[in-house]
Amino acid sequence: MRLREAILANLPRLMHEAEHYGKINIQDGTKGGRSGASAPRWIEVDEHIHDALRYAEQVSPDGSRNLLASSESYFDFQQRIVRPARHILQMHSLKGFHELRAAYACERYEQITHHLAPINGGDCFQTDHHLDHKARVQISYELGHSRIDVVSAYIGGRA
């Protein structure tokens, strides 16, 4: 999920989907007008995602369906929570939240192909073009990108 998607996610709906379908549909806070039933983006839920959803529900303000308090703007949340958290990431040599998306993409590539992502020294593209392409299509979908070439920025190119 993008940071905005995570902040604005309808947590009760995601928990319901996770428990009943084993996957969640990313709809809120999406980029480029791709939201709701018109542009479904179903993501399989593993134990890590379940844990993250449970934690998000625990820290969600009373009366809120997402991470924002009812009187809080997205900008206020950015200033109060995101900026300090970004500073913590930087203290651990991470440039920001986008690097966490890249780590997720690399992990998914490895789960799908059973090879390291190209950026981590993997060579799946050289040994199995079809499997590499399948992984890129899936990861592109999960990240909410309409073009698979964008995935190369996260997992590395095909060289």
Q: Across the structure, where does each feature detected by a protein language model lie?
A:
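Short, basic interhelical loop/turn and adjoining N-cap
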Residues: 13-16, 145-150
